Amino acid sequence: HNNTIEIPQTVNGGYDFSHLSLKGIVIKDEDLSNSNFAGCRLQNAIFQDCNMYKTNFNFAIMEKILFDNCILDDSNFAQIKMTDGTLNSCSAMHVQFYNAAMNRANIKNTFLDYSNFYMAYMVEVNFYKVIAPYVNLFRADLSFSKLDLINFEHADLSRVNLNKATLQNINLIDSKLFFTRLTNTFLEMVICTGSNMANVNFNNANLSNCHFNCSVLTKAWMFNTRLYRVNFDEANVQGMGITILREEENIPINSDTLITLQKFFEEDCTSHTGMSQTEDNIHAVAMKITADIMQHAD
């Protein structure tokens, strides 16, 4: 009994898998560029070392799927429903992920330059060592997610929900975070130099070694927040509401005096590595974050 099926070709020379149900398939080292997987159901699927340039996955349903070392540039993942999916060591630039639902996705060692995650639902996603300048995450839901070693320069994270997320070693230089929700979030070594963060909400957040120098923080919310070595140098903090938690004590602070209180956040530094907050140093840290990402990107 022969199980092979003839897959028709698309007009652009790819394969047409649209609306098929594919379970347990393993495709290695194939050219699937311009293929069509629209409305496809993929369960326990593995794509390894494949060229999937301009592939269409619109409305596909993916469960336990792995893209390993694949080229996904200019592909369409809009409105997919993905559960427990992984993108490892992929190039996924200029990809459309808008309105995608990607529960518990794992995205690591991957390039996402200029990709579009508008209104994507990405709860409990794990981003690790990702290069994503100019990425659009406007209105995406990233609550409970974990982000470590990310280059988000010039990215748009406005109105993103990052409630209860963990952000470590993030380069957000010149990015947009207005009305972004960072409530109950843990932030360590997050660099937002020159970013637009008007109306951002940091209530109940825990910030350590973060840089907001030269950023716009007008009307930002920072109530019940723990700050440790946070740099507001030359930031615009007009109309910002802030109370700082120290032990169990809640201390209200006038935003106008915020910048003069730098030393206040530098206490009890013995357990932390010293880092002066000069412009050169911040740039060096941003470069180091990028270097650390790149180290394993190949």
Per-range role (PLM):
Residues 2-287, 294:
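Tandem repeat scaffolds
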